[in-house]
């Protein structure tokens, strides 16, 4: 039955009577075995100690009390108490219920009994004597206490389960939050990568290997233009400076012999310089000299400047007053005494200088007899050979060293007709360039006729100087250099009386290269062929190294004849193809093979159209792109 106050299950009257009878029987058995009252008292005290130990174990699992011994002593004490003092047992149970009244106890006695008996039976299976004692006694009080502790443990487990459930809920919430943050971070990363790719596409790539070839081509093109421009400026500047120098030498007095401190010398210089300085030609040269400093390259006007430079200077137009002044100056110079050691050689030198002045007519009264060339000059009006052969009045006469042959072609152009430099022999001396200047001139029918005529043409030329004048110059003891416009040939006379009129060059003919007289250099039997409209770089290179159709190669012609084999034809073709020759030779000189250099040129021809098609540019375009090499 259940106590209404403590809710503790207590045994009924029948169970108490049954317990007392069992207790009496047990006590009788103990007396028979000689246990006596002392043994019963010991069991009662052991029962109390066992109950406290069970409570201590249930409340404090870490206690070191032996649960097995406590259960054994409790069961023994309960059996003795139920048989001898039922009221005390009942009171003890009531007290025990009051002691643990704060612990919630299950309302189901059946369930409690089941849990309690199950726990008791599992803890004491190995001791047969203890099981016999429990089965013989009344375990109601023990079951009640065990059920209370089990209920308490169950309540604690429920609290722990709720706490664990809350913890798991928090963990799930955190995992969901982490997953959401991860998804947001992935979306943010994707957007950032997309923006970075867009920025990367907008930024120009400087180290793109596809653009290196284009950059190299543009650089080569700019370098070629710069080289062509600089070479052209040097040629034009040197030509203009040479022309101005020759005109200034006309007015210079450094080459004139010393005339002493006579009054006639000052009058002579004034009378000689003033008439020419007042002319229009002298002023035009001064203006041209100033303009030369501000020269600007105009490639389209190359041929125009050539034509202008090829024109001879205009003949000086003198008035009648100027002629009278010059005539008086000549008469005053004739009357200058030439005796004395200082001026012993003055007469012939001055007469040689005046040989290039205007042919001034003089009256018979003004003429004086003179054994020098001046008399020949005065009488030249009646000499048809000298009259027809006199030079331009704007000529430059230099008395002194006559070794001016190297200045003959200072202004000669080394350019071909397209305006690009053709340095056939590279860096050569000035004399070598003079001999090969024919290669840089425009060949016409007249020039070719002059070349075929040979040196004998000078002897048949009616404009050649008479032999008497030449001998007088040779015997005068002076060394005279006569020069004219850049296109006329200079006459150099030295102290040698073995000059012959057949060896004198014509005054108004252009300089020409005299070839050797051996049959090899006359190029009469040379047969060669150049490829017409080549379609590949390999064909041009084979033409240079091997030859076409068994004919001599270009390299062989260059090594054997120099530039003489192409003076009359194929000049432009060779000048254009020479750029390809030089490009390949420079690569071979730097350690590359001929095939590699040819492949480089072929790859330069390849380009891509708007329709993304690969095509090749022409050989002419390739040659033009290599200008300046």
Swiss-Prot record:
Polar residues composition-biased segments: 475-486
Keyword Transport: no
Annotated region (Disordered), positions in chain: 1-43, 378-511
Keyword list, A-Z: Activator, Nucleus, Transcription, Transcription regulation
One GO-annotated biological process of the protein: positive regulation of ribosomal protein gene transcription by RNA polymerase II
Localisation per UniProt entry: Nucleus
Basic and acidic residues bias: start-end ranges: 487-501
Keyword Membrane (UniProt): no
Domain of life of the source: Eukaryota
Transmembrane segments annotated in the record for this chain: none
Role, per record: Required for a complete transcriptional response to osmotic stress.
Family, as annotated: Belongs to the HOT1 family.
Name under which the protein is recorded: High-osmolarity-induced transcription protein 1
């Amino acid at each position: 039955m259940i106590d209404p106050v403590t809710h503790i299950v207590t045994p009924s009257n029948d169970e108490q009577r049954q317990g007392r009878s069992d207790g009496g029987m047990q006590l009788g058995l103990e007396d028979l075995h000689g246990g006596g009252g002392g043994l019963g008292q010991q069991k009662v005290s052991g029962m109390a100690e066992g109950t406290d130990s069970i409570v201590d174990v249930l409340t404090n699992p870490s206690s070191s009390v032996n649960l097995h011994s406590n259960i054994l002593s409790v069961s023994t004490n309960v059996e003795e108490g139920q048989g001898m003092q039922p009221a005390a047992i009942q009171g003890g149970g009531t007290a025990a219920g009051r002691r643990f009244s704060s612990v919630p106890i299950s309302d189901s006695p059946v369930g409690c009994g089941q849990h309690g008996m199950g726990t008791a039976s599992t803890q004491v299976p190995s001791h047969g004597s203890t099981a016999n004692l429990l089965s013989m006694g009344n375990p109601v009080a023990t079951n009640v206490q065990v059920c209370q502790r089990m209920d308490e443990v169950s309540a604690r487990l429920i609290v722990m389960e709720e706490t664990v459930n809350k913890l798991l809920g928090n963990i799930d919430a955190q995992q969901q939050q982490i997953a959401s943050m991860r998804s947001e971070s992935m979306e943010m990363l994707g957007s950032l990568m997309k923006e970075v790719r867009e920025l990367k596409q907008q930024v120009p790539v400087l180290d793109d290997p596809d653009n290196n070839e284009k950059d190299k081509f543009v650089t080569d093109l700019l370098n070629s233009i710069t080289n062509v421009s600089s070479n052209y400026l040097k040629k034009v500047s040197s030509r203009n400076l040479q022309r101005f120098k020759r005109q200034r030498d006309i007015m210079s007095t450094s080459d004139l012999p010393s005339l002493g401190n006579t009054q006639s010398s000052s009058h002579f210089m004034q009378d000689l310089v003033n008439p020419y300085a007042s002319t229009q030609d002298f002023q035009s040269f001064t203006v041209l000299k100033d303009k030369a400093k501000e020269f600007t390259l105009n490639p389209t006007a190359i041929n125009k400047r050539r034509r202008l430079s090829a024109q001879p200077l205009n003949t000086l137009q003198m008035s009648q007053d100027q002629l009278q002044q010059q005539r008086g100056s000549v008469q005053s110079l004739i009357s200058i005494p030439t005796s004395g050691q200082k001026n012993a050689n003055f007469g012939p030198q001055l007469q040689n200088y005046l040989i290039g002045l205007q042919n001034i007519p003089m009256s018979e009264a003004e003429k004086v007899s003179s054994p020098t060339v001046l008399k020949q000059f005065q009488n030249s009006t009646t000499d048809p050979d000298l009259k027809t052969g006199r030079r331009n009045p704007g000529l430059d006469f230099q008395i002194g060293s006559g070794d001016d042959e190297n200045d003959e072609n200072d202004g000669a152009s080394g350019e071909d007709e397209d305006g690009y430099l053709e340095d056939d022999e590279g860096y050569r001396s000035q004399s070598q360039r003079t001999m090969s200047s024919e290669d840089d001139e425009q060949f016409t029918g007249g020039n070719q006729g002059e070349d075929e005529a040979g040196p004998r043409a000078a002897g048949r030329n009616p404009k050649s100087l008479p032999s008497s004048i030449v001998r007088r110059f040779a015997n005068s003891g002076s060394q005279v250099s006569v020069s004219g416009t850049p296109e006329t040939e200079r006459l150099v006379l030295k102290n040698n009386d073995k000059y012959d009129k057949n060896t004198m060059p014509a005054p108004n003919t252009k300089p020409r290269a005299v070839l050797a007289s051996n049959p090899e250099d006359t190029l009469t039997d040379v047969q060669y062929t150049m490829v017409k409209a080549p379609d590949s770089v390999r064909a041009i290179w084979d033409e240079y190294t091997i030859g076409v159709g068994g004919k001599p190669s270009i390299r062989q012609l260059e090594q054997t004849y120099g530039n003489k084999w192409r003076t009359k034809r194929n000049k432009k073709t060779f000048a254009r193809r020479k750029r390809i020759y030089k490009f390949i030779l420079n690569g071979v000189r730097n350690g590359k093979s001929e095939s590699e250099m040819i492949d480089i040129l072929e790859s330069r021809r390849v380009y891509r159209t708007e329709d993304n098609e690969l095509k090749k540019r022409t050989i002419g375009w390739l040659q033009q792109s290599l200008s300046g090499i």
